[in-house]
Amino acid sequence: MPKRKAAGDVSQEPKRRSARLSAMPVPFTPELKPKRASTSRKTKTTNVVEENKDASTIPIPETKPEDVKDECNMENAENGEAKIMEAPIPKMEAEEVKEQINEDTEEDGGEKKEAVAAEAKDDELKANIQDVEKDEDGKEHKDTGEEVEDGKIEEEGLNEKPGTAKSEDAEVSKDEEEKGDNEKGEDGKEEGDEKEEEKDDKEGDTGTEKEVKEQNKEAEEDDGKCKEEENKEVGKEGQPEEDGKEDLHEEVGKEDLHEEDGKEGQPEEDGKEIHHEEDGKEGQPEEDGKEYLHEEDGEEGQPKEDQKEGQPEEDGKEDQPEEDGKEGQCKEDGKEGHHEEGGKEDLHEEDGKEKDGGKEDRKEEGEQEVAVDEGSDENKVEAEEEGAENKDFKQDGEKEEPLSIV
């Protein structure tokens, strides 16, 4: 562990540091703006303008004739006539340009000669081919071939002689003319080929148009056949639908007739039920034993007779609509049944009056009650038999009615 410094040493450290810092050089930042002089602003501005004028005015020696012409132009402009005179090109510059052109032509001369020789060989081959073609066609252009050969000989002679720029220009112009002729010939051939191609294209187009028309016709025929078949199928489907509709109408008519017949049959059946109810009512006082033997015998005979009479009437009612199929007869039969029921009710009322008068005699006659009980049992059995017969008649009537309508 380092020993702690004494208090005197601690107090001396800041002094040492300050001494070291004082030894370091202080960075100096120079001012950008110069300090003002002691003179005033007005005097200073005048001096600066004079100094600028002195610096801009520099004496230039005037030795060229162009300056003199410019001065003349300025004088003319002052008089109202502005004339611009172009300075003539010095002769030395024109001579230098000619020398440079000659040097360039001499350098390119060798290359041009080689290119001309190669072109001459190609031209000879083309000329030979053309001559063969012309001989086959009729030997019409022999003179042109000879002229071309003469022109080539002259060109070769000119190329062999090292001439000036004029001779080279002449050769270039001739080469261009020959190339133009060759290009014209090639253009003619290309035009002929293009015409043939156009003819072929037209023929191909006409052929394709015919094929397209034929395909369209075939497609239309197929569509027509398909439509006819569809119409036939639709017609066949429409017939069974119409037949089905007619059958439905017939069935509806039959159902309506059955409903009417059922309605007409209801009053008859209601009348029959009323008969059974009345018969049951008649049987109740007999069970109580409140009637005389004579009354019992008379009442028992009446419902039996009524039942016997009612049965043939019911049979006639049901048979008449089956045989004739007329609604009027059914109605009349229903009316007759109502009248019969009215007559039966009157008989029962009279019997009730007689019952009230003979209540006292019933008590004395005990033996007669046994007979009354037996008669009441017989009436119950007869009423049940009549109900079963009526149900059978109802079922038979419902089954036979549709047959009579058909």
Curated annotation (Swiss-Prot):
Any one annotated GO CC term: nucleoplasm
Residue segments, region Disordered: 1-406
Effect of residue 22 to E: May abolish association with nucleosomes
Superkingdom per UniProt: Eukaryota
Subcellular location: Nucleus
Chief place of localization: nucleus
Tissue expression notes: Expressed in liver, spleen, lung, heart, kidney, muscle and brain (at protein level). Widely expressed with highest levels in submaxillary gland, thymus, kidney and liver and lowest levels in brain, lung, pancreas and eye.
Biased composition (Acidic residues): 188-200, 312-325, 366-376
Cross-link (Glycyl lysine isopeptide (Lys-Gly) (interchain with G-Cter in SUMO2)): 64, 98, 121
Any one of the GO BP annotations: chromatin organization
The keyword Flavoprotein is annotated on this UniProt entry: no
Keywords: Chromatin regulator, DNA-binding, Isopeptide bond, Nucleus, Phosphoprotein, Transcription, Transcription regulation, Ubl conjugation
Pfam families in the cross-refs: HMG14_17
Positions bearing Phosphothreonine: 29
PANTHER family: HIGH MOBILITY GROUP NUCLEOSOME-BINDING DOMAIN-CONTAINING PROTEIN 5, NUCLEOSOMAL BINDING PROTEIN 1
Family listed: Belongs to the HMGN family.
Role description: Preferentially binds to euchromatin and modulates cellular transcription by counteracting linker histone-mediated chromatin compaction.
Domain note: Specifically targeted by its C-terminus to nucleosomes in euchromatin.
Protein name: High mobility group nucleosome-binding domain-containing protein 5
Protein species of origin: Mus musculus (Mouse)
